[in-house]
Regions:
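C-terminal "capping" alpha-helix adjacent to the active site of nucleotide-linked donor transferases
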Residues: 69, 76-93
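C-terminal alpha-helical cap of glycosyltransferases
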Residues: 107-122
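Catalytic binding pocket for nucleotide-activated donors in carbohydrate/polymer assembly enzymes
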Residues: 40-79
């Protein structure tokens, strides 16, 4: 853990973020596996991508209205992030919608489906 206050915690290099996600109101992430973990937990999240490839996948996932995608980090106006965070936290309907849409989308069975697809090819 890098920093903790009454209002927020900054976490870095944890092997298991699930316990933190289950207690959080909102997550702020770069796009990757952590976003999928947050969706599985029903944690609303604000997301940026750190590569052009991740930007493509994040845009596709954002079509499901399961996160607030800000875009590729070089295109994000960092001065606007504070307002986006406060607007999101203060919009209970948005938080609930993001949570519900995310948890419906990720069922935790993706690795099983992938292994079955590989098995069927063999």
């Amino acid at each position: 853990m890098l920093f903790r206050s009454e209002r927020f915690t900054i976490i870095e290099n944890k092997n298991n973020l699930i316990p933190f996600m289950q207690k959080a109101t909102l997550g702020i992430f770069t796009f990757g596996v952590t976003v999928y973990e947050a969706l599985y937990c029903g944690l609303p999240c604000i997301v940026m991508s750190h590569s052009k490839e991740n930007d493509l996948y994040a845009k596709k996932l954002n079509e499901y209205n399961c996160m607030n995608y800000l875009g590729y980090y070089k295109s994000v106006k960092f001065t606007s992030i504070q307002k986006i965070v406060f607007d999101t936290i203060n919009n209970q309907k948005l938080l609930k919608d993001l949570s519900n849409n995310g948890s419906k989308l990720i069922d935790g069975k993706g690795s099983y489906r992938a292994s079955q697809a590989i098995k069927n090819i063999m």
